[in-house]
């Protein structure tokens, strides 16, 4: 259902003031739809079927926003790579995505990306529109988010410290 909804929303996404780069493979019907959208939206959509690590890193570095609307994601590394490059992740709050992406708070000027809770295309689009609004109309907030994303500590040292604190609490 969600995949079908997303495919139906692609024309709305194409109407947004953005360019879209899609890298990956999946169901044949989705790949075909992406190829059709690319053909009909030259300069607006680029689709690369398959995976190319070098291209992936160029995409991370060139983008402003990295969309990762996963149904299930036990950890996820793509959002971490995107943050290191200064590309803000827009994720569905699941698994490791929820653990690593702190959503933008416009009042406190905090966060390192954008997120949505429910697995539906309308909620995702609403958050996309918000992210685009921040990008175009609240440039200082965007810069803060990029800085926060690039400074997000996802090192093993931080994880080890968290585990040591947890074990210390259990031992007490």
Walk through the language-model features, giving the residues of each:
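Short alpha-helical
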Residues: 28-29, 54, 96, 122, ...
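Nucleotide-activated donor-binding/catalytic signature segment of Leloir-type glycosyltransferases, i.e.
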Residues: 14-58
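C-terminal alpha-helical cap of glycosyltransferases
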Residues: 156-172
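Conserved small/polar residues in nucleotide/adenosyl-binding loops
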Residues: 1-5
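Active-site-adjacent structural elements in folded domains
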Residues: 6, 50-53, 130-131
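Catalytic binding pocket for nucleotide-activated donors in carbohydrate/polymer assembly enzymes
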Residues: 58-151
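Short acidic-capped amphipathic helix/loop micro-motif used as an active-site/signal-coupling element
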Residues: 7-11
